[in-house]
């Protein structure tokens, strides 16, 4: 008996099979941006921007729309450039025009529409961050105050971005015999396993898979790590920030909590997620470092975990600096009032 969850048979990358330009991935991005826009507008409409940030300049709906244009543009550019040049530089440094080329050739050599697959969260974070900085400089708003509102607005939308990855059958986890494992039908041949290897047959048996007569390869169950990320980095992180939004001690606190929380959750979920084959483990002190498809040791650190560690350290440093600045301002104000 199969001891894994069946991937939904009705779910395909295309919303309507045969219409490649209508894809769940793109739709989920639109939903994510829409949710972030709604939550940001909600906070501004209810006076939370002025009340909890100390910012005296009112923000209009036109300001919000302009901000999101800058932020989304920075996010998309950063996510795509970072995702291609950091994770697959060999291909894109030779042909940089492919970075924004939404087509690829399938196994038969036919040109097919794929959209912008290979969007890096960390690149999107940096790009969106820079976009918001540029907008606040242009519009004369306090960056830390605006960033706090963005931090509260983003995670719930991010949830749908990961659901888009799930619909694409990409960014899946490592193989597992757990009952919450899932067989992704879109798994390419390069990520399937040869039945000639005894450990593969044993693994398939533990997972309750039936091996077809004459089959040479098998698609093993994997952790649906996209759903883990959607839940922890999306829903849970959003709930934490939503509850803290009226209790922040200083401007910039919430964006630091967001960066810290995302880095923390993602670091541990990376142990379930399969690293990029061309990157493997940049840091490996544990056993089985060559086997990226199965968890061997917590000492094997992926590129994603290195980037998350930098996020955690940067958020802690920024939080300390902002706290000391706020403390200094209060002391200065107290001396003046005294």
Swiss-Prot record:
GO biological process: lipoprotein biosynthetic process
InterPro entries: Lgt
Domain of life from the UniProt record: Bacteria
Enzyme class: transferase
One term under GO cellular component: plasma membrane
Annotated pathway: Protein modification; lipoprotein biosynthesis (diacylglyceryl transfer)
Membrane-spanning ranges: 24-44, 67-87, 115-135, 141-161, 224-244, 252-272, 304-324
Family: Belongs to the Lgt family.
Protein name, per record: Phosphatidylglycerol--prolipoprotein diacylglyceryl transferase
Organism: Treponema denticola (strain ATCC 35405 / DSM 14222 / CIP 103919 / JCM 8153 / KCTC 15104)
Gene (name only): lgt
